[in-house]
A protein has these predicted regions:
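Short secondary-structure transition/capping segments
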Residues: 1-4, 21-29, 48-55, 76-88, ...
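Rossmann-like dinucleotide-binding domain that binds NAD(P)(H)
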Residues: 1-65, 111-118
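Short, well-ordered secondary-structure micro-motifs
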Residues: 12-13, 70, 147
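A general structural signal for well-ordered alpha-helical segments in protein cores
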Residues: 15-16, 89, 93, 120
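Short glycine/serine- and small hydrophobic-enriched flexible loop segments
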Residues: 20-21, 98, 122
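C-terminal substrate-binding/catalytic lobe of Rossmann-fold NAD(P)-dependent oxidoreductases
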Residues: 41-99
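C-terminal helix-rich "cap/oligomerization" subdomain common to oxidoreductases
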Residues: 102-165
């Protein structure tokens, strides 16, 4: 189970990337499970099924900050940890520097990043279709998508002058 807060894509994509980092590629379907709300805030839950039998559950919280929390359950034990959000970008920059210096690094490969986006798009398609299982291979340009321009404008408005033209 992976959890993030902020919005369904900006923070949610990092949860999908974390799933890829833990499980690898091979996601087959995503299913929207539902929404819970309280005091004007809401969370949504999604189920991801992989070809190798592994499954993942991720939750997004909209309009409220939540830490990145990961719980891994196996047939033998459970493990839970919270990512230190104050160090995430520092860690990413260190890995980018290693990559640029041709040193070993832990950056996600392109197939993992692409599958992360497909997981999010399949989740949006499932939500739009009332919670049906959506195969990643069935995604099309006609399905739900994310509006990069609208995202950038909202992000810039919330973040200040650094992100404006």
């Amino acid at each position: 189970t992976l959890t993030a807060g902020g919005d369904d894509f900006n923070s949610g994509i990092h949860i999908a990337e974390a799933i890829g980092g833990l499980v690898g590629t091979g996601a087959q379907t995503v299913q929207y499970l539902g929404r819970g709300s309280a005091q004007g805030q809401y969370s949504e839950s999604y189920y991801v099924q992989f070809a190798n039998g592994v499954s993942a559950l991720y939750n997004t919280f909209t309009s409220t900050w939540q830490p990145f929390v990961v719980t891994i359950m196996t047939t033998k034990s459970s493990y839970s940890f919270k990512m230190d959000s104050s160090r995430l970008y520092e860690a990413l920059l260190q890995e980018i520097c290693c990559f640029m210096e041709h040193k070993p690094n832990r950056l996600a490969d392109v197939p993992t990043l692409i599958e992360s986006v497909k997981i999010m798009l399949a989740g949006a398609a499932s939500r739009a279709d009332g919670g049906s299982k959506v195969p990643l291979c069935d995604l099309s340009e006609d399905g739900p998508c994310y509006d990069g321009t609208a995202f950038w404008k909202n992000y810039a408005a919330a973040s200040g002058p650094m992100y404006t033209l």
